[in-house]
């Protein structure tokens, strides 16, 4: 169901079993192809090198006046040409860095090679190259897959409740009450959105911002004793920290050798979003925050409390989006185009997910969530409409700054589904996937 269709339809939880989902997907789509996986690794590294070579060639391109095809007769033309070439480099290299993140994400799910150590070693280096702690993120991300859309247990983008904003009870709250707390100028909204896109990743890594609030203050992804991790994961956390220190050292010595400006231009600007061009350059970290936020933050998608949550319901509470069109498929490895399939089959290689999506759409039917909205507008829409949820209710939707939810639960149909669900003990589906979800 597309966004507009969901808006006009009361919500009914999917009356679907895990067996129905699994039976719809041919087993060959779940198999790894090491040669094909190797191709994608080589391809992404090659594109990174190609874009880096392009960056090194910018001044030569200007001196040659674009190979003689575009004479530059004035100083302003040279400056404009230089600015456009650098922006092109930052955009494409940013996509390349984002492809490293998405490949490491697949390695974290053990989807590309049969050998666990091969997956972990390659994922470790791909993530370290873009200053991401592989084993730490792998641990919290796999926990997210086991508990997706659970208000009590999910790891990421857990909605704020009414009490967080100190709003009056809904029975006596007025529109003015909501606007006093939640309304803001467009400039302030864009400023907060820009902050989330630029530094949201590091806020999550260092302070657990936008993460589960069941963890104590000081929770982060760098301490092996963080509440996020089990004792057997601590060695991996230390190794992740060593990888970050190693990459940081490489960048430090590169700045000593080639200058800080060179490291900024060739590495850090593709790594983060920068000010005035943020609308056109959601690179690396901005892309990562954008795609992960939009997977699970939408006014028409539910969150569940424990009495109504099941693993199947949580996995279905995600959204497929055509983020960046062909560029998203090529560089981001289907992570947004086929995110629903990824949550149902996180152990399947990304290159088979388009086919898996086709298979499960026939089972999910109206419970398959898709949004054809331009992803940049969808980001703004979710950021401004997904404000808070109520403290009560087993199935809840985000409310906007007016205290209104985009959808309501079809209570009459929910009772019928609940009787069938409890009879089949649907909540046990969580247990089946807690193993395969890695």
Located regions from the model:
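Transit-peptide-like, low-complexity N-terminal presequences
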Residues: 1-29, 371-438
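Topogenic membrane-insertion module of multi-pass membrane proteins
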Residues: 1-92
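Hydrophobic transmembrane alpha-helical segments that form the core helix bundle
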Residues: 156-322, 422
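C-terminal, well-structured subdomains that either form a transmembrane helix-short loop-helix hairpin
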Residues: 329-363
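Membrane-embedded alpha-helical segments that form the functional core of polytopic membrane enzymes
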Residues: 66-67, 71-103, 121-135, 322, ...
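Acidic (Asp/Glu-rich) catalytic motifs at the cytosolic membrane interface
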Residues: 97-116, 137-151, 295-298, 336-347
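Post-HEXXH active-site segment of zinc metalloproteases
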Residues: 61, 113-129, 157-161, 354-359
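Intrinsically disordered, low-complexity domain-flanking/linker segments in eukaryotic proteins
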Residues: 59-80, 171, 326-327, 418, ...
